[in-house]
A protein has these predicted regions:
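Long, low-complexity intrinsically disordered regions
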Residues: 1-169
Length: 169
């Protein structure tokens, strides 16, 4: 499947359905709900849909470049977050999402704020993007029109690790 990018969630689901034999909107939505297809920022700060089986090797190829670009951009907007704070945020994400829980960004922000991590919308975007890039979180099961996040390790079973050459092939 590769990665499919779109600004509009309905259109990217349609794009997936168009590329798969005998897919319907229902089968695409079921695959998203069950974590067979993930919604992520794997290649840049735009939504992509990827097959769950591909997420780890894609992150391995792209994450460091995306993290560096995001950090550079953030410094220009006074959004620089120290690595120690990312570590604290990641530890909290693992704690609050453990047990196959899926939470919205707003629910996660409430946990962050209660734990002393300032979690306004701009900072939450940074925390969530970094956690995605580091393979800590991925998309959870949507709640109506609200996106949720879950732990990658709980949502996607382990896959054989690919070499860089295999990933690029």
């Amino acid at each position: 499947m590769g990665a499919m990018q779109a600004q509009n969630y309905s259109m990217v689901k349609w794009a997936v359905g168009m590329r798969l034999k005998s897919a319907t909107i229902q089968t695409v939505e079921k695959a998203l709900r069950e974590g067979e297809i993930l919604r992520t920022h794997v290649m840049r700060p735009t939504w992509h849909l990827v097959a769950a089986e591909d997420i780890r090797w894609m992150l391995k190829l792209s994450a460091q470049r995306i993290i560096s670009a995001n950090d550079s951009f953030a410094k220009g907007y006074d959004l620089d977050i120290p690595n120690e704070l990312y570590t604290k945020a990641h530890d909290l994400l693992e704690k609050i999402l453990c047990g196959k829980k899926s939470l919205t960004k707003q629910e996660i922000a409430e946990h962050f704020n209660r734990s002393g991590i300032v979690a306004d919308n701009r900072r939450m975007t940074r925390f969530m993007a970094r956690a995605e890039q580091e393979g800590i979180i991925c998309s959870g099961e949507d709640r109506g029109s609200k996106f949720t996040y879950a732990l990658l390790e709980e949502r996607v079973p382990p896959m054989p690790e690919l070499t860089k050459d295999e990933s690029l092939a």
